[in-house]
Amino acid sequence: MKFLHLADLHLGKRVNGFDLLEDQRYILEQILALCDSNKVDAVVLAGDIYDAPVPPAPACTLLDWFLTQLAARRIAVLAVSGNHDSAERLDYAAGLLANQNVYIAGQFRGAPRQIVLNDRFGPVEFTLLPFVRAATVRHYMPEADLPDYDSAVAAALSACAPSAERRVLVAHQMVVAGLCPPQLSGSETAPLTVGTVDSVDAAHFAGFSYTALGHIHRAQRVGSDTVRYAGAPLCYHLDECGTEKSATLVRLGRRGVDGIDTLPLHPRRAMRHIVGPLAKLVEHPADTGDYIWATLTDPTPQPDAMAVLRAAYPNAMRLDYRPQGAEILPADTAQSVRGKPFASLFEDFFTQMNGRPLTVEEARAVKALREEASK
């Protein structure tokens, strides 16, 4: 059996105000071509199918088209909800869709859904575990001792008995290998407690031939070659610029995984980060249709900078300043800034943008403006 592992489609997503629906359709057409050329038997969608609990109507139409194309090819679909999805809405018509070999597990109902597909070697069990919170598991298991997220997910998995030797888990969770968290991107919503109470140890998946994960937008293995995040099929953030997106092709043999291939995906428009003075960036623009994140190194803000940039790059998404010579400081996290006084936050920001601290006079002016604004 061959199946394609996908995740984090985020249909309907907008990045800096840009609607990416046509880009998403373009990449789904590529995925269908990969299904055809590799003669896959199934497609796994490991959560965050939509970008929002109430997706825009065109996103729903796009998913309908994609599932219809797969069903017409007699390719089974095994999908779970993610933290961005509405589990209840994703479950709509799930029973009817199952008649077309489209199996969707939106809500957790006390145990993962188990689907058995067959190939020439016999049955393959797909265990579908949607994104679930510890409180939801406790609701179904009130007598169990489930002190944290890890124990709750472990209990959820133990609620179903294996029905085949070859087993594939489909899940949308934050998974770590021991104390090693996955490599995050700026576009996914990840808990600040990665590696502690809001993560799941990959050791719980030892009984599965392959674990198909969603939630993290960079394709990567988690401790083992057979525990993997597929990653998002498109770049959705500045720090994903330059990363190669892919779909994961898994081949199952008689005893388990026979091979795993990473199949490159090529976007309709690349997402790029360009750095330099505004005049230089627009002097000889290249690949002008790309999505552009620009960092200007001009010593002072430039008049109508975004308008000038978009005259050269119509799809310029965002513009930031980092004057030449300014110290590049690590980005603040929510944890590092929480509780910090306004004056300290502003001074850190000013230093990062200008390469020098506030003078005494500037600090006084900022304080006065702050007090005036608070009245």
What spans do the regions from the language model cover?
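Binuclear metal-dependent phosphoesterase catalytic core
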Residues: 112-125, 129, 227-291
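Conserved catalytic scaffold of divalent metal-dependent phosphoesterases
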Residues: 92-194, 233, 253
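Active-site neighborhood of phospho(di)ester-bond hydrolases with catalytic His/Asp-centered motifs
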Residues: 6-7, 43-48, 76-83, 103-108, ...
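N-terminal active-site segment of His-dependent metallophosphoesterases
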Residues: 1-68, 72, 363, 368-375
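Conserved beta-sheet core of the metallophosphoesterase superfamily
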Residues: 177, 181-258
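Metal-dependent catalytic neighborhoods of phosphoester/phosphodiester hydrolases
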Residues: 15-16, 49-66, 81-101, 106, ...
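Accessory, non-catalytic peripheral segments of nucleic-acid enzymes
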Residues: 37, 42, 251-375
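Active-site environment of divalent metal-dependent phosphoester hydrolases
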Residues: 12-13, 51-53, 80-90, 110-113, ...
